[in-house]
Every structure is written in structure tokens, then in C-alpha cells.
Amino acid sequence: MKLGWLLLAYLALALAFARATPPLEASDEARHLGFVVHLARHRMLPVVDASRPGLAAHEALQPPLYYAVGAALVGPRRLRDAERFYVPMPGSTIGRADLPGTRFMFTPPDRPRPRGTLAAVRRLRLLSIALGAATVLLAWATARTLSPDDPDTALFAAALVALNPMFLFIGSSVNNDNLVTVLSAACVLASCRASFAPARTRDAIVAGVAIGVALLAKASALVLVPPLLYRIAAAAPDRRAAARAAGAALGAAALVAGWWVVRNLVLYGEPFATTLQAVLAGNLRPSWQPLALLREWDGFVKSFWGVFGGFNVIYADGVYDAFFLLSALGVASVLVALARPGLGRDPRVRALALLAAGNLLAVAAWTSRLLGSQGRLLFPSSTAIAVLAALGVAALPARARRVTQVAVPAFLAAASAWACLVLIPDAYAVP
């Protein structure tokens, strides 16, 4: 398979996911659209009041970049009738795939659909699909940068991203995860290609600006900071040079995204308004539970690979068993990559590992306070994870390597096709 064919497969599957999932029925899509509606109508950021949450609810506290782009793309006229979508469906089984009942969260299927909002949702989903395609390209380019003489490894890394059913599902919905994922992938590629030599402070400044832009997409981009500081420290001849470059990078990031943090501090008393967001979402745990992610690892792994709809459309257990095995093999492959002579000592590779580990720790911290262990929260480091896994597979004996590089993408493609062509359409079939 060549890169062009992989991109075509990604686009075909993503469009099929977009067609299969009814408007606003993807995870949190209604709330993300609500933020776009507010910006398109009012042309100013919302000031969130817990007593009047609005269509966006807790998502109105997200950084605004994705929604600003979306509002500019669709305009206010298409969204005049958006409220007609936000009619709760009686008997909905949100978050409970094990219960009988309808999978629809909003607007009973026999109600007339507002055409303007339908067109806006389609356009915003196409934006997300385009961002996903860019992420796939960036994953390929990152692997090519680290292993320039091995095109098969680069293609395998790109396939691990492109054919992940959950990546395709979220990537075909209205969701700011898609923007922070592609911006994180761009930061990863830039970090792998930059020298961060003491005489090139510009590299640190550019990296800081990129992270600042990513932070305006989603606060989870903070996980990009430790790998950047590590790359700077590894390239610097002494502590003074490292401090100078790190200061330049952090200063650049603060200039780009600092206003958003200050605004939150002024309005909500926290840099990212986390408490208010949890109150509005209704997912604040009664107490701090530092080991929550370990206890909920089953759902965490499942939702990295594929849990659809309002967390109420799932695969059969056998498919998840295969995903558990694939996850274990992926972790083993990452460890092999880090143990490979020469490769494991490369600061660029270590930075990728630091990003993946930092993202996992950030999710664990988030889960210790909030309900809902979602594997898709690892998507900001999905490029790093895929590249490391691909580099580990490259160390296998030739035959095992070839089999893995064919079998894994084939399984992911089959699972994705089953989800978007059978599983999701059946879940939303109207008798």
C-alpha cells in the first residue's frame, strides 16, 4: 500500500462514518456545535454561567480556536434553527450500551430536520476530516524523518493513525480534539526536524508559538511542553543556554495563549476553568481517586479503539479482545523501539516517549478527579505512539515484520468498515 492509497482509504472510511452517524449523535458533538453557534451569532466569547449553560454547556469553557474556525466556515445564517436539534430523546441510553432502548440522544428521528444546521454540521465534519488527513500525513512524515531509509515503517505508522476506528469516528464529527491532534502532530514533526542548537534560538521560539496555537485548540496541548524542554536541554551545551532557549519557547507560547489563561483566571478563578467545566458536565467525582484509571482500564482501552455514538454503540466482546491484544503488542513495540541500539538514545525518540508517557499521566490525573476514562484523550500523542510502535515493529525479523505491517492495518480497516457500514447504521435504524 502506498501513502496515496492509505489517504484514500482514510477519506472513504471517514466519510462513511460521517454518513452513518446522525447529526449531533457523536460524542459531545452537540456541545461542540453549541460553541460554534454562539460564536457565529454573537462574534464574542461566551461568559459561562452555571445557571444558564446554553447549547455549548461545559464545552463553552474550551479554548476557542476550533470553534472560531468553524464559525467562520459556516456563518450565522445556517445556524438560525440550531435549537430545533436540541430536543432530548426520551428513553435514550447515553453511556449505557448494555441497556435496551434508543441510541439517539437528540431529536426523535420522525421530527423534521432543520436544513441549515444540517448543512453546517456537514461542513464542520468535512473540516474535521481534513484535519484528520493532515494528521495522517504528519505521522508519515515524522516516521520518515526518524527512519528515512525505511518507507514501510513510515507507512505503517501512518496506517496505525488513519485506520483506528475511534480516530475515524471522532475525526468525522464536530470536535476540537481534531484540531489539537493535528497541531500536536505538527509540533512533533517540527521537534524531530529542528536542531535546537544554541545558535538557533529561533527553533525554540517557533516551537513555543506552535504549542501556544495548540493550547488555543485544547488545554491538553500542555503535554507538549515537557518534550520540548527535554529537546532543548539535550541540545544545549550548558544550563545557561538551555534556560535561555527554554525561556524563549515558553515566552512565545505565553504570548500566543497567555491571554486565554488570564481570561479564565479573571472570570472563573482557575487557569482552565476545570471546576466549573466539571460542574456543568456533571462528571466530578465525589472524592479524589488517584488510581481510577487503573480500575477503569477496560473502558479506557476500548474507547481508544472504538466506542461510538453517545458512548452507547459498541463492538462485540471478541473485537475488543483483539484490541486488547493489539494494545499489548503496541506497548511491547514501543519498549522495543526504546531499547534498540542507537535509536533509544536519540533525543527525538526519547521526546516522543516523553510525550506519550506525559499524555497518559495527564489523562490519569484528569480521571482521578472526573468520571469517564476515555482513551481518545491520548490522541494528542497518537502520532508519537504510532511512530514508536512502528519503529519497534521494524526491529522484528523480516517475515514477522512484513506480516505485522500487513495484518494490523488490515484488521483495523476491517473493524472500521464494520463499524461505519454495519454497527452504527444498525444502532440508529428507525423501525
Predicted features along the sequence, with ranges:
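Transmembrane-helix signature of polytopic, membrane-embedded enzymes
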Residues: 4, 97-115, 139-163
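Perimembrane helix-loop-helix junctions
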Residues: 193, 224-254, 261
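Membrane-lumen/periplasm interface segments of multi-pass, membrane-embedded glycan/lipid transferases
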Residues: 265-339
